[in-house]
Amino acid sequence: MCIRDNAEDLPKKLPNIEDKVVISIDDWQSRRSCPKGKIIKVLGAPDSPGVDILQIIYAHKLPLRFKNKVIKEAEEFSSDIPEEEILSREDWRDRPVFTIDPADARDFDDAILVEKCDDGSWELAVHIADVSYYVKPGTELDKEAFIRGNSTYLVDRVIPMLPEVLSNGLCSLVPGKDRLTHAAIMKFNSKGSVISVRFCKAVIRNAHRFTYEEAYSLLKKPDPKNAFSERLTTAWELAKTLRSRRFKSGALELDMPEIKVILEESGKPTNLVRSENDISHQLIEEFMLAANEAVAKHIKNKMRPSLFRVHESPDADKLFDFRQLVLSYGLEIGDPSAPNELQKLLKSIQGRMEEHVIKVGLLRSMKRASYSADPLGHYGLSKTNYTHFTSPIRRYADLIVHRVLAAVTGSVPSSTPKFDELQQTANHISSTERTSSSAEMESQKLKLIEFLWNEKKVCQDGSPASHPAIIHEVRRKGLFIELTDLLIKGLVPERALPHCREGYW
């Protein structure tokens, strides 16, 4: 590249030739010509702390800071809720609502309460942070939230959709503080079928904050001395019933483990923690799914334009490729377009060595979920009506849905966006979601590779580090494998494999 810059000034901007820089390309007439541009920012040396992640942030054009006018608007809110606002809402502050979140979370979107009734039915209250009280349409906060579309969770930081004074402060359902919520109150019979649903604006005071690890521990070993242990057990009874009912209706069980990279302050990866979708995660998952579906049904029944979370059925050619993969393992499958056939397959491979490969193959055959103003349904969840309502602190889609729900329930004036405007919003936030997902995966991959590289340097005594692996694909150029303990995928080139004889490994 030809850098257009003042020759005398260049050493000041680029003190080291290996520095990572951000450039803008001013002219690139053809691929045969050298592009011309200018340096707009020097990130620093490649091995400087944080430069690797900054490179990803700039490459994906993610915003690093909020504009001053956005921060100013956020800081104008009082930490005290006006008394007239509290009086206009249902008061749940004396009810034992609680939260379950990751240990390092600070933006608590949701709180729950489950009560078992004498007739064997359950009442589930899902309280969601009422971000729409603070972020009004057309404000600077709203414009910025729309541009960002969602929060981005990189391996070493969060790039929030809203300023921290809201995302981690006034909107976050932290313990012991009065917080405004938009609630879905659902009643289920003993078999998990919905009896009734109502929605309300409320004020709560989070009575207890669980981490997922704490909740899991109490669910596996209840503690009579813990006042919330029994409530947690009751909640899991309902969640387990809803989960069973969901899979019977055709939902696909595609839960996959995840890896969390633990970093030093310098950004160096020191440990990897494997996270499974255990019963504490499943409990919250089922309640959020129930609330999202209830909201989608209500809005659709009121025939009000809104945003929906949609997941279309896979293309036939993708399913054909998946079927070939299944058959190559000697497994049986009927019509792969039939959810019951996929369920039967997934159940038959539980605990088997090929389970992970088959699940990955099935996920690859699926279309990507997105947002739409058309209620097209959700294939993977087997739901005709579905939306996103439960995370308005970190997703703009949920904020829009909160506004629409408030309009149809009479909580606020009834003006809401038209269909065409909503579809444009859906296209935009689907795009920002893809961008964030790409950046998140890239930052994770970067630190996983760094972890392996450091592991290799530690093993210079000649005893190489070893990891269990599975082969996903056999290609002409080598083997596409996955380290199952680290969930890292990559190609082992043919030249690196031991050869039995020419053309064979």
Question: For the regions a protein language model found, what residue spans apply to each?
Answer:
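Charge-lined substrate channels and their catalytic hotspots, especially those that engage the 3′ end
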Residues: M1-A125, S132-K177, K447, A496-H499, ...
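Short helix/loop capping segments that flank catalytic or ligand/cofactor-binding pockets
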Residues: R32-C34, D47-V51, F108-D110, Y134-P137, ...
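Conserved catalytic alpha/beta cores of large enzymes that bind or transform nucleotide phosphates
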Residues: S151-K248
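Glycine- and acidic
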Residues: E164-S167, K220-K225, P269-H281, M303-R309, ...
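Conserved pre-motif C helix in the palm subdomain of viral-like polymerases
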Residues: N189, A227, T233-T241, N277-K297, ...
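Core structural elements
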Residues: R246-T270, E286-A296, S313-P314, F320, ...
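Structured C-terminal cores of nucleic-acid metabolism proteins
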Residues: A294, E312, D317-F320, V326-W505
